Structures are given as C-alpha cells and as structure tokens.
C-alpha cells in the first residue's frame, strides 16, 4: 500500500524512502514483529479458550512431552496474519514472485490449518491423510512454479560452480515442486520441540534475504557470477516480514511454549522458503542453508525404510531431535545446539555465493 502511495505523483519526495527495498524490508520486519508482540497474548488466550485440550501429544513420543498436554496449537495463524498485514503495507503488488510465495504460504497454511483443526477436534495425532495432503501441496506448488517460470529460465545452478549446469526444461517443474513440498514437510518434521523450528526458519530467511537481494541486483549478480533474476529483490520484503513475525512468535514459543506453531505455520513457512529458493534459482543452496531440515527429514526416511527392510532401527527415535532426547540431552540443549548448527549452515550457504 505504502509502495503504491510512494509511486503516485506528488508523493515522490515525501515517501522517497519507501522506494528502497532495504527500507521496506526493515519496515516489514518491524511491522510484523509489533503485530505479533501486541496481539500475541490475546490470540493465545483466545486459542486456549476455544481449543480446550490443545495440541494432542503422541503416546509413542518421549515421555517428557506428555507434560505439554493442553498447550494450544495453530500458532502459525499468528505468524501468517502478521506477515500478510506487513506485506500488504510494504510489498510491490505487481511482483509475480511475491504472489507465488504468498500463494504457497497461504495455500499450505490452509492445508496445515485443516490438519491442525482435525487433530484438535478429534483429539487425535493423525490429522488429514498424508496422500491427500501431498496431492494439494503439489497442486499449489505447480501453480507457484507456473507463476515463477514465466521468464522461461529452467536452468539448474550448483553451489561453488560458476554458471548453469544444465537446462532441465519441462523437468524443472516437478523438480521445483519437489523442492517446495519437500521443504514444507521437512520444516514440519523439525517442529517437534519448543522453538526448534522457529529459529532455523528465521536464520534461513536471513540467508535468503541476502540471496534475494544480490540475485535481484544486476551488478552484484554479475560480480558474484550468480543468476540475475529481475524483480527477485522484492522477496527481501517477504523474508523481512517472516523474520519479524518469527521473532514475535518465538517470544511465546520459547521453552516452555505458551503455544505451538502447528502444521499451520510449519507447512506455510517451509513452503514459502522453498518457493523463495526456486524463484532465486538457489534450490541446492537451500539444501545447505536448511541442512537441519534435510537431516530431520532424512532421519525419518532412513528410520522407516530401514525398519521395513530389516526390522531394526537406525536411530533411537525419529525425527533426529528425538534421537538426541533419548540419548539424554535435555530439550533446551537439543534446541540451542540445533540453532547453532543451523546458523553455521546458513553461513556456509552464503559462502557459496562467493566461492565459485
């Protein structure tokens, strides 16, 4: 909204700052942060009243988690509302990349909300069928890929390598959709401890703030030897809003959590990160920056596959964070150490921009 005002004749001098992406990114972060902090307590109180029993706790999980019974879920709604309002105020509505990310964020958020609602109302940990959920997720992801790939760039870029490796052509669509859906569900699997998924999402968003900015800037992109995507710089406003809303949510999600993110938030934020990676053509770098999410997802895949084949478990419990809990690590220890790993991986991912 403010961007449109700044573009209007007669307001150019008064609102000149709004033309700058960096200013709008900071403003979006502060706006989302304030919305979350101010309205968070009321939102949590409302959720406590209407959810009664709160988030169902798995019987086969760590026994220490049973003490969390009654904690409300669907906290991702708070994040989505804060991000959406912030984007409405600060984004450029004419940018197709932002709309692709919003479509995934809200679409996956709806899927997660339905899943959370089903769990809460049925007092069950099962939720929506996995096949049904994946079907809708891939449908939304392919739509986002259609919006993003109108420029026709279907080339694949690798870290530490200067220039494109291969033109995937039509195969880029399923590849990109897999990145989006895979990231969403990986973040969803990571969201198992208080604050565990929130900070890595914030860290990954910070990394892709940098990536989006340099990819959208022709001078920086040419200097670094990375793909230049005109208009991708606008995605920094989205990353700023996610960072601000994420910190606001973490204020209430820090141990002991007053509210859980739920599938509403984890699917939406993970899908949005995947879409940003596709839009900036840094899909493989996302695998480095979001290496924690990849490790969590792989631990589940390995555990299930190995057990089906050999009737033995590789990990004491999956996802990976539960394995370390079973080794005797306290929940805060697991969370903080995973945060440190996430930060280190983000630095490594950013290093690939220069080391080519």
Swiss-Prot record:
Q: What is its EC number?
A: 2.7.8.13
Tell me the route in metabolism or biology where this protein functions.
Answer: Cell wall biogenesis; peptidoglycan biosynthesis
Look up the record and report any one GO term of the cellular component aspect.
plasma membrane
Give the transmembrane ranges. Answer: 27-47, 74-94, 97-117, 128-148, 164-184, 201-221, 241-261, 284-304, 333-353
Q: Does the keyword Transferase apply?
A: yes
Q: Name one GO biological process term.
A: regulation of cell shape
Q: How does it sit in the membrane?
A: Multi-pass membrane protein
Q: Where in the cell is it found?
A: Cell inner membrane
Task: Report keywords, A-Z.
Answer: Cell cycle, Cell division, Cell inner membrane, Cell membrane, Cell shape, Cell wall biogenesis/degradation, Magnesium, Membrane, Metal-binding, Peptidoglycan synthesis, Transferase, Transmembrane, Transmembrane helix
Q: Which reaction does it catalyse?
A: UDP-N-acetyl-alpha-D-muramoyl-L-alanyl-gamma-D-glutamyl-meso-2,6-diaminopimeloyl-D-alanyl-D-alanine + di-trans,octa-cis-undecaprenyl phosphate = di-trans,octa-cis-undecaprenyl diphospho-N-acetyl-alpha-D-muramoyl-L-alanyl-D-glutamyl-meso-2,6-diaminopimeloyl-D-alanyl-D-alanine + UMP
The protein's required cofactor(s) are namely: Mg(2+)
The record, for InterPro entries, names: Glycosyl_transferase_4, PNAcMuramoyl-5peptid_Trfase, PNAcMuramoyl-5peptid_Trfase_CS
The UniProt entry, under PROSITE patterns, shows:
MRAY_1, MRAY_2
**Main location per UniProt?**
membrane
Q: Name one GO molecular function term.
A: metal ion binding
> Which superkingdom does the taxonomy of this entry point to?
Bacteria
As for what it does, the entry says:
Catalyzes the initial step of the lipid cycle reactions in the biosynthesis of the cell wall peptidoglycan: transfers peptidoglycan precursor phospho-MurNAc-pentapeptide from UDP-MurNAc-pentapeptide onto the lipid carrier undecaprenyl phosphate, yielding undecaprenyl-pyrophosphoryl-MurNAc-pentapeptide, known as lipid I.
User: Per the similarity annotation, which family is this?
Assistant: Belongs to the glycosyltransferase 4 family. MraY subfamily.
Q: What is this protein called?
A: Phospho-N-acetylmuramoyl-pentapeptide-transferase
């Amino acid at each position: 909204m403010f961007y449109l005002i700044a573009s209007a004749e007669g307001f150019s001098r008064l609102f000149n700052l709004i033309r700058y992406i960096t200013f709008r990114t900071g403003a979006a972060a502060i706006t989302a942060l304030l919305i979350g902090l101010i309205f968070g307590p009321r939102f949590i109180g409302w959720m406590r009243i209407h959810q009664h029993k709160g988030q169902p706790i798995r019987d086969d999980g760590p026994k220490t988690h049973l003490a969390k019974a009654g904690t409300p879920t669907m906290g991702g709604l708070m994040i989505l509302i804060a991000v959406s309002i912030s984007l409405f105020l600060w984004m450029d509505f004419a940018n197709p990349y932002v709309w692709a990310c919003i479509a995934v964020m809200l679409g996956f958020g709806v899927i997660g909300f339905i899943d959370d609602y089903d769990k809460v109302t049925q007092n069950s940990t099962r939720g929506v069928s996995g096949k049904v959920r994946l079907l809708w997720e891939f449908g939304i992801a392919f739509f986002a890929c259609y919006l993003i790939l109108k420029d026709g760039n279907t080339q694949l870029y690798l870290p530490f390598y200067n220039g494109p490796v291969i033109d995937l052509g039509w195969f880029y669509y399923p590849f990109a959709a897999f990145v989006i859906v895979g990231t969403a569900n990986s973040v969803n699997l990571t969201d198992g401890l208080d604050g565990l998924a929130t900070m890595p999402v914030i860290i990954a968003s910070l990394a892709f703030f940098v990536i989006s900015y340099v990819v959208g800037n022709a001078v920086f992109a040419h200097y670094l030897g990375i793909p230049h995507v005109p208009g991708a710089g606008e995605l920094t406003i989205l990353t700023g809003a996610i960072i601000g809303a994420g910190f606001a949510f973490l204020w209430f999600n820090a141990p002991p959590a007053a509210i859980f993110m739920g599938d509403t938030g984890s699917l939406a934020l993970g899908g949005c990160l995947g879409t940003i990676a596709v839009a900036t053509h840094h899909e493989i770098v996302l695998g480095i920056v979001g290496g924690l999410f990849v490790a969590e997802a792989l631990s589940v895949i390995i555990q299930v596959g190995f057990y089906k084949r050999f009737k033995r478990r590789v990990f004491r419990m999956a996802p990976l964070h539960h394995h370390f809990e079973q080794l005797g690590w306290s929940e805060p220890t697991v969370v903080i150490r995973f945060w440190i790993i996430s930060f280190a991986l983000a630095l490594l991912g950013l290093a690939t921009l220069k080391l080519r």
